[in-house]
Amino acid sequence: MSDALQRRTGSDYIEVGATLLAAAAEGQAGLAATIVSPPTLVLGSAQSATDAATGADVVRRGTGGGAVFCDEGVLLIDLAVPAGHALAPEDVTEAYRPLGEAVQHALAGLGVDCRTVGVEEARAMDDARKAAARRACWAGLSPYEVVLGDGRKLVGLAQRRRRGAVLHQVAIPVTTPPAEVLSHLVEGALLAQWLQETAMVASVAGCGSATPVGTWDVLREPLNALLRP
């Protein structure tokens, strides 16, 4: 599968992850980058379909967490690796570390003042915020996700494991505000206070690469390097 940035429907995006995961189970690491059209609400694997409001296509991804609203302003990245790879240690949390650090370093090259989330920082979320994160990805924090220096969330990470392989998924709002998801969730306004703690690359980058294409140009080689044995 090509690692060139591709425009895909929501359903095709879901299929990309499944295809990469199956290939990884056979020993082949892979990488794909996507922008979604038409706009689609992507639910987490265990999220209730009743969370979705009308007005956009709805699909369900294989990784957990809350919903992400995806359109041509959100960069989606899938990486899949076989068991035994550096991105597939037994410790699920630590599997995120090299990926989060690579994304953080690349975004810093765009002039973004950002850092990765510490394990204890993520665990310190109160119950109300944890509940919000089960509905909207951007409402919560997970270890090694990328946030700005002031703590606003910039990059979401998720992971799916099957026998012999691990799929990592990355979501980066480049020109679409993360809070756009609120319009596509039932009673989404109730989550607004947590979505204020988010940002998009276009509003914080210090150079002209703050488009999905430009952002992928910066991330493509570092992420390919992660896949190499």
Predicted stretch roles:
Residues Q47-D91, P98:
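A glycine-rich, hydrophobic loop/mini-helix early in the fold
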Residues M1-T54, R60-R61, G84, K130-C137, ...:
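Active-site loop/lid in soluble adenylation, ligation, and acyl-transfer enzymes
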Residues S45, L79-A83, V103, A158, ...:
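Short, structured patches in soluble enzyme cores that scaffold and shape functional sites
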